[in-house]
Amino acid sequence: MKKKTTLSEEDQALFRQLMAGTRKIKQDTIVHRPQRKKISEVPVKRLIQEQADASHYFSDEFQPLLNTEGPVKYVRPDVSHFEAKKLRRGDYSPELFLDLHGLTQLQAKQELGALIAACRREHVFCACVMHGHGKHILKQQTPLWLAQHPHVMAFHQAPKEYGGDAALLVLIEVEEWLPPELP
């Protein structure tokens, strides 16, 4: 451990003289986010329940009408179409990534449900879902499942840096977070 260096009396007096007439600045420009809970702090039973609740929305029988021409995209009716444009341009950078490679459809649904629940719990607005190319099963099903979930605001085929046509950028509706009151 290093020794603490102390200032001489002369240096301390000089410092006090230079600082005379100054006042402490009140910090009011940075709003601190609440610390995120680690996933390990959330009870396992709650995680399993959230995952089951979220995957409840994914049906294989219901086929939402999605545009089949061009890149895969979807915007919920109450959300601005500019959000899809922002996703396409890469204005949103995903904070959570989900890789569905090698999963069955059932496992993929459960993982999608867990991702959406985690995004809402952690206040994450944008996530990336990598479905891959493979046999095109997950590539075709993933957009259909996401379009059914009420907390998915929009999704768009990811830009090249996030996986291109083998991935989707997803906007998740999170509960409104208000900054803490400043004293």
From Swiss-Prot:
Gene3D superfamilies: 3.30.1370.110. Keywords: Endonuclease, Hydrolase, Nuclease, RNA-binding, rRNA-binding. It is an enzyme of class 3 (hydrolase). Correct positioning in stalled/collided ribosomes is probably required for activation. Pfam families: Smr (PF01713). Transmembrane segments: none annotated. GO terms for molecular function: RNA endonuclease activity; rRNA binding. It comes from the Bacteria. SMART domains: SMR (SM00463). Residues 1-97 are annotated as: N-terminal domain, required for ribosome-binding. Disruption phenotype: Significantly increased readthrough of strong stalling motifs. Hypersensitive to erythromycin (which increases stalling at specific mRNA sites). Its EC number is 3.1.-.-. GO terms for biological process: rescue of stalled ribosome. Residues 98-173 form the Smr domain. Has a probably flexible N-terminal domain and a conserved C-terminal SMR domain; the N-terminal domain is required for ribosome binding via uS2. PANTHER family: DNA ENDONUCLEASE SMRA-RELATED (PTHR35562), UPF0115 PROTEIN YFCN (PTHR35562:SF1). Associates with collided ribosomes, but not with correctly translating polysomes. In stalled/collided ribosomes specifically contacts ribosomal proteins uS2, uS3 and uS5 in the collided ribosome and uS11, bS21 and 16S rRNA helices h26 and h40 in the leading (stalled) ribosome. Acts as a ribosome collision sensor. Detects stalled/collided disomes (pairs of ribosomes where the leading ribosome is stalled and a second ribosome has collided with it) and endonucleolytically cleaves mRNA at the 5' boundary of the stalled ribosome. Stalled/collided disomes form a new interface (primarily via the 30S subunits) that binds SmrB. Cleaved mRNA becomes available for tmRNA ligation, leading to ribosomal subunit dissociation and rescue of stalled ribosomes. Belongs to the SmrB family. This is Ribosome rescue factor SmrB. It comes from Escherichia coli (strain K12).
